[in-house]
């Protein structure tokens, strides 16, 4: 009988209980003798040799675990060498996966034939999965866009020269009020500054603001006291703020229209709300 058959017989009998050999009980007396009814003799005589405990026999060949620790694969002890067991227990998880797929000879004694493991010997591109899974990785890689191609695409964003183009502004000037013409002219002078600063690269058009914060603050202060400004005060503000007389006049006209709109919105809010 070959070693393979011996291992199969051992594997089939691995769940049977462990018994001490029969010659050790040759000098044992009967379990219940009929001479006395009160005294019960133990099945082991005093002159019997000391039998080694079952767990010590089971773990004797391992030489790794303590006899008090139970091991669920104790019956395989006599079929593995100590070096092989230590090498198997010290393997990392990644090394075990590689040896299962690449080195089938180490675990060949667990299987009946090597033909069942031939599918795992051919490792694909992934390094873990077989070659049959390479088609899924190829399709996944083909679907991913190339980042270099996206970077090489030219920037097709429209520059901010549209604010300085008179053809586009001509249509807007017809729709706007005549009071906005001064602001439109002042915004044309700021187009060169926007090109140099690089703010024209943004998609959204920059808000036109020909007046500085200091000028707006002084104009708002004057509008708070006088909604309608006379010519003398208008000339005084234009000299103080470095503006033209027409710019100050247009600003007050726009500010009065804005105030009228705000008052109309406030009236609609308070009349529509029943709490007021």
Swiss-Prot record:
Q: Which domain of life is it from?
A: Eukaryota
Q: Which GO terms describe its cellular component?
A: nucleoplasm; nucleus
**Pfam families assigned to the protein according to its UniProt record, in alphabetical order:** DUF3528, Homeodomain
Asked if Nucleus is a keyword of the record, the answer is: yes
Q: Which residues bind DNA?
A: 204-263
One GO MF term attached to the UniProt entry: DNA-binding transcription factor activity, RNA polymerase II-specific
Q: Which SMART domains does this UniProt record tie to the protein?
A: HOX
The UniProt keywords, alphabetically, are: Developmental protein, DNA-binding, Homeobox, Nucleus, Transcription, Transcription regulation
Segments carrying the region annotation (Disordered) are 139-207
Gene3D superfamilies in the record: Homeodomain-like
Provide ranges: composition bias, Polar residues. 139-149
Among InterPro entries, the record links this protein to: DUF3528, HD, HD_metazoa, Homeobox_CS, Homeodomain-like_sf
Q: Cellular location of this protein?
A: Nucleus
User: Could you provide one GO biological process annotation from this protein's UniProt record?
Assistant: embryonic skeletal joint morphogenesis
Which family would the database say this protein is a member of? Belongs to the Abd-B homeobox family.
Q: Its biological function?
A: Sequence-specific transcription factor which is part of a developmental regulatory system that provides cells with specific positional identities on the anterior-posterior axis.
The name under which this protein is listed is: Homeobox protein Hox-D11a
Q: Which organism is it from?
A: Danio rerio
Which taxonomic lineage does the organism of this UniProt entry have?
Eukaryota, Metazoa, Chordata, Craniata, Vertebrata
């Amino acid at each position: 009988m070959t070693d393979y058959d011996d291992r199969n017989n051992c594997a089939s009998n691995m769940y049977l209980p462990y018994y001490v050999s029969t010659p050790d009980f040759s000098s044992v007396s009967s379990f219940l003798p009929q001479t006395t009814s009160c005294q019960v003799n133990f099945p082991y005589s005093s002159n019997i040799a000391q039998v080694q405990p079952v767990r010590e026999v089971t773990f004797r060949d391992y030489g790794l675990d303590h006899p008090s620790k139970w091991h669920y694969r104790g019956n395989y002890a006599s079929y593995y060498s100590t070096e092989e067991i230590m090498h198997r227990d010290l393997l990392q998880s990644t090394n075990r996966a590689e040896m299962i797929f690449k080195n089938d000879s180490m675990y060949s004694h667990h299987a009946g034939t090597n033909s069942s493991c031939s599918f795992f010997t051919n490792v694909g591109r992934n390094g873990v999965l077989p070659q049959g899974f390479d088609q899924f990785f190829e399709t996944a890689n083909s679907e991913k866009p190339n980042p270099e191609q996206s970077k090489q695409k030219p920037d097709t964003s429209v520059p901010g020269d549209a604010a300085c183009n008179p053809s586009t502004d001509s249509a807007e000037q017809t729709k706007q009020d005549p009071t906005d013409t001064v602001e439109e002219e002042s915004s044309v002078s700021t187009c060169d500054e926007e090109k140099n600063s690089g703010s024209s690269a943004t998609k959204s058009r920059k808000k036109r603001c020909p007046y500085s914060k200091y000028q707006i603050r002084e104009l708002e202060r004057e509008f708070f006291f006088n909604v309608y400004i006379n010519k003398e005060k208008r000339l005084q503000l234009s000299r103080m703020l470095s503006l033209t007389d027409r710019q100050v006049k247009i600003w007050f006209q726009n500010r009065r229209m804005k105030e009228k709109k705000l008052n109309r919105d406030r009236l609609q809010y308070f009349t529509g709300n029943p709490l007021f």
